[in-house]
């Protein structure tokens, strides 16, 4: 399938770790900025916001990178075992990643994290497949062209507006509106 052409697995893992770290750093900075602003004393809002961003957003980035690295590693292992690359690999990888990251919390939390990871990845894969198929159909050169647009010359004359309305409006503002000036 064309939608699954990516880097080879050893490079994919590093690429996904870096991308996940960047997403976690940016998202964590935004999230921590709101929390720092909300919890800071009056008159110290900016200082509190920057302190929270500096101290906590890198931790969020590292946690995202750990998730991304584990997900990519499991995904690459599944590709090697199954000998094909399809959405099932990503869904199973999301579930196993959620389970492995929650393993110290007990079997109930581990099962919940596995289900949540699988459901989230299934939704992401579903949206990706629908989007790819929809865009692929739009770009298919074998499809007939869309219906021809009407030639402006064949549309006829413009209808006249009611008397007493301003006809000279600049910048593409439609004519036929009452003059408000």
Curated annotation (Swiss-Prot):
InterPro entries: Tim17. Residues 137-181 are annotated as: Disordered. One of its GO terms (molecular function) is protein transmembrane transporter activity. GO terms for cellular component: TIM23 mitochondrial import inner membrane translocase complex. Keywords: Membrane, Mitochondrion, Mitochondrion inner membrane, Protein transport, Translocation, Transmembrane, Transmembrane helix, Transport. The chain crosses the membrane at residues 17-37, 61-81, 109-129. The lineage of its organism: Eukaryota, Metazoa, Ecdysozoa, Nematoda, Chromadorea. Pfam families: Tim17. It comes from Caenorhabditis elegans. It is a multi-pass membrane protein. Essential component of the TIM23 complex, a complex that mediates the translocation of transit peptide-containing proteins across the mitochondrial inner membrane. This is Probable mitochondrial import inner membrane translocase subunit tim-17B.1. One of its GO terms (biological process) is protein import into mitochondrial matrix. Its main location: mitochondrion.
